[in-house]
């Protein structure tokens, strides 16, 4: 679980985290990914949270993939604050968030709003303070139960809400009205062997924009294969091929606040292009469990060619 990974991350050096993360990014690049949102959240103390964010910054400079950083110290309540979740959030607000902002370590702030983790009121408290400091907002909500996280997302104008397997019709309506993007993580549902996938069709019918993302993490979703996630979007979320492609291109660009730079072929945008070995738009979602990437271009430069990083 999360706390097991927290223990391992606290013991890991910068170099160890960098090397492991670089391997994941290489794998993603080989599968056609050119921009990644990376979250902290496996430290739950300042030293380790900063180390994770420093790794993200270093890899953003060093790797062909562009990284967008999210600060998520509110991923869980650390063992040393067990039973004192509000006190831990106050520590984040008073000590961690100002330092993250001062050192420009992250663009977004996220929290896990779920029964047994943080309540809707606690999530509102943290995200309101983060918004005042100039952070863009995300929230993990409605993964196992609907406890008001999507209401917080709508009230505060969050860029996105993640998971949403248990989203209600009313919650979907509120998110659609507030233009909250639904970041759907079907590989997590698959990995946990759950039956309920996010109601993607209801979201689209309500006017929500959605993305499909890997949720790559060592606990609940140990995959970095976006093509597999796209296939789950078709098979388990009833999305069409065009809807899937929108979810991993222009909608994803909006979710990381890069819509003016990436996500579509437009004059003035960066030429991030993935060419698949596929005869039509349907084929990558029909021929599953295979990497179909032929070439990847980052800002117009060839970075992957026939299964190898250039």
Curated annotation (Swiss-Prot):
Zn(2+) binds at residues 140, 215. GO terms for cellular component: cytoplasm. 4-imidazolone-5-propanoate binds at residues 42, 75, 143, 220. The keyword Transcription does not apply. Pathway: Amino-acid degradation; L-histidine degradation into L-glutamate; N-formimidoyl-L-glutamate from L-histidine: step 3/3. N-formimidoyl-L-glutamate binds at residues 42, 217, 219. It is found in: Cytoplasm. It comes from the Bacteria. Its cofactor is Zn(2+); Fe(3+). InterPro entries: Amidohydro-rel (IPR006680), HutI (IPR005920), Metal-dep_hydrolase_composite (IPR011059), Metal_Hydrolase (IPR032466). It is an enzyme of class 3 (hydrolase). Keywords: Cytoplasm, Histidine metabolism, Hydrolase, Iron, Metal-binding, Zinc. GO terms for molecular function: imidazolonepropionase activity; metal ion binding. The keyword Protein biosynthesis does not apply. Fe(3+) binds at residues 140, 215. Its EC number is 3.5.2.7. It catalyses: 4-imidazolone-5-propanoate + H2O = N-formimidoyl-L-glutamate. Binds 1 zinc or iron ion per subunit. NCBIfam families: hutI. Belongs to the metallo-dependent hydrolases superfamily. HutI family. This is Imidazolonepropionase.
């Amino acid at each position: 679980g999360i706390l097991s990974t927290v223990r391992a991350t606290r013991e890991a050096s910068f170099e160890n985290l960098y090397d492991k993360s670089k391997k994941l990014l290489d794998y993603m690049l080989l599968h056609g990914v050119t921009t990644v949102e990376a979250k902290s959240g496996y430290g739950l103390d300042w030293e380790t949270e900063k180390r994770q964010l420093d790794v993200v910054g270093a890899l953003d400079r060093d790797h062909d993939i562009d990284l967008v950083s999210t600060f998520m110290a509110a991923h869980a309540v650390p063992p040393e604050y067990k039973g004192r979740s509000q006190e831990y959030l106050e520590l984040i607000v008073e000590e961690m968030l100002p330092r993250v902002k001062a050192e420009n370590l992250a663009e977004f702030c996220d929290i896990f709003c779920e029964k047994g983790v943080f309540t809707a009121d606690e999530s509102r408290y943290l995200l309101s303070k983060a918004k005042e400091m100039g952070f863009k907002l995300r929230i993990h909500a409605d993964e196992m139960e609907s406890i008001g996280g999507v209401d917080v997302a709508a009230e505060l104008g969050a860029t996105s809400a993640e998971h949403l397997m248990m989203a209600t019709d009313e919650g979907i309506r509120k998110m659609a009205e507030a233009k909250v993007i639904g970041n759907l993580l079907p590989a997590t549902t698959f990995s946990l062997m759950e039956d309920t996938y996010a109601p993607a069709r209801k979201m689209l019918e309500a006017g929500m924009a959605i993305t499909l993302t890997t949720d790559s993490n060592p606990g609940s979703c140990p995959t970095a294969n976006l093509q597999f996630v796209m296939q789950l979007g078709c098979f388990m979320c009833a999305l069409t091929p065009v809807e899937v492609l929108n979810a991993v291109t222009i909608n994803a660009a909006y979710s990381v606040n890069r819509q003016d730079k990436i996500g579509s072929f437009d004059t003035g945008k960066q030429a991030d292009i993935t060419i698949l070995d596929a005869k039509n738009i349907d084929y990558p979602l029909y021929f599953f469990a295979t990497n179909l990437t032929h070439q990847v271009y980052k800002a117009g430069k060839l970075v992957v060619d026939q299964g190898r990083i250039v």
